[in-house]
From Swiss-Prot:
Organism per entry: Archaeoglobus fulgidus (strain ATCC 49558 / DSM 4304 / JCM 9628 / NBRC 100126 / VC-16)
GO molecular function annotations of the record: lyase activity; nickel cation binding
Family, similarity comment: Belongs to the LarC family.
NCBIfam families: nickel pincer cofactor biosynthesis protein LarC (TIGR00299)
Entry keywords, A to Z: Nickel
UniProt protein name: Putative nickel insertion protein
InterPro entries: Ni_insertion (IPR002822)
Keyword Metal-binding appears in the UniProt entry: no
Length: 395
């Protein structure tokens, strides 16, 4: 698995996130194309600077006074010719900010007016960052963030002086999984930075990685530590690290357990799930639900198991190794009772060890020919093995 880790040891803002992504998630030419597609009037520069001895990229945008309603910001994004994925996620980031500001000011977020966040420079930061994230996502990356340093003290906004973290930042954090550290001088985590990281990143949990690339995005202020956001690109050092998530339930009907299984198996982070009949306390009939998940997604899967079953306790069991044979699936033509059928067949390797026809295809043939499925199964295997033996003897 490819990972992109945002190490926000000194906070994060939109321009710092974008600067850290320069050259690894987005090129300068792509940024020019995004600005052209948006049709906004911004003056910006991209430079390399030294921050306390660390070489970092810096993106600077000329700030201008201006405000827009949430609807106006959406219209700018929707009317552009950017990819639909970029539009959708940029709108989602702005909606996070709008909802937070609406909650703080006690108004409908859809009718609100952005002040600093509605200016061209903020639109530039958000949409260019989203473009970079989408590029990395297409390349197979998943996104994580270390605990973000949020700052302390007070900060001036158009509405007046606010404590750090500002109320809008705290509202954004309420709806995200980001972890923060309430420390540092001044405002270190901005609403734009909080919204972008909240939308894309999961909290970083310990797992081994191989570091492939490191990039730094510089902030504007001088602080007691290097004012940079560190982006680490790498790959997990495990190939098949999994956990078994397990819980016992004795108060759900068969229909409810079946529904839970169905919803779990629809998730891309659930590799498999089984239900085992058991007896619980006082010899009550119960079910043990076992779910296999990648290690780095185990907390989300465990939370979903609790939500679907109402269970108050979940066991997460690390599995250090599981052996998976190499597999392939192919479609073979088989003649049965004078009719030819396409049958999907799974094989495992190395060598010819297992052969398994797809049961859905077996069922179709059984219904059409009005013969039992087990007869169809035997006939398919016999025909395939016979044909392969004939080919090998002919050679």
């Amino acid at each position: 698995m490819k990972v992109a880790i945002f190490d926000a040891f000194n906070g994060a803002s939109g321009d710092m996130i974008l600067a850290s992504l320069l050259g690894v998630g987005i090129s300068e030419e792509e940024i020019d194309e995004v600005v052209k597609a948006l049709g906004i009037d911004v003056n910006y520069s991209m430079t390399t600077v030294s921050v306390r001895g660390i070489s970092a990229r810096r993106v600077e945008v000329e700030e201008r006074d201006g405000e827009r309603s949430f609807k106006e910001v959406l219209e700018i994004i929707r009317s552009s010719n950017l990819e639909e994925g970029v539009k959708k996620n940029a709108i989602a980031v702005f909606e996070l900010i709008a909802r937070a500001e609406g909650k703080v000011h006690g108004r409908d977020y859809r009718e609100g007016v952005f002040h600093e966040v509605g200016a061209d420079d903020a639109i530039f930061d958000v949409v260019c960052c989203v473009k970079a994230f989408e590029n990395l996502k297409t390349a197979g990356y998943e996104f994580f963030a270390t605990p973000v340093r949020a700052g302390s003290g007070f900060v001036e906004f158009s509405h007046g002086k606010y404590p750090v973290p500002p109320p809008a930042v705290l509202e954004i954090l309420k709806s995200s999984n980001l972890e923060v550290v309430m420390d540092g001088e001044g405002e270190l985590l901005t609403p734009t930075g909080a919204a972008i990281l909240s939308h894309y990143c999961k909290p970083l949990k310990p797992f081994p990685i191989r570091v492939k690339e490191v990039s730094y995005g510089a902030g504007k202020r001088e602080t007691d530590v290097p004012n940079v956001l560190r982006l680490i690109l790498g790959e997990t050092a495990f190939h098949d690290s999994i956990v078994v998530i397990e819980t016992s339930v004795d108060d759900l009907s068969g229909e409810m357990i079946g529904y839970a299984m169905k919803k779990l198996l629809e998730r891309d982070d659930v590799l498999d799930a089984v239900i085992i009949p058991a007896y619980g306390k006082k010899m009550r009939p119960a079910s043990i639900l076992k779910v296999i998940s990648p290690t780095h997604r185990s907390e989300e899967v465990a939370a979903e198991v609790m939500r679907l079953t109402g269970s108050l306790g979940i066991r997460i069991i690390p599995v250090h190794h599981r052996l998976i044979s190499e597999r392939m699936e192919e479609v073979v033509k088989v003649e049965i009772s004078g009719k030819e059928f396409d049958v999907r067949v799974k094989r495992s390797y190395p060598g010819f060890r297992h052969l398994k026809p797809e049961f859905d295809d077996i069922a179709v043939i059984a219904d059409e020919l009005n013969i039992p499925p087990h007869v169809v199964y035997r006939e398919i295997v016999r025909k395939i093995v016979g044909a392969e033996n004939a080919d090998s003897n002919g050679q």
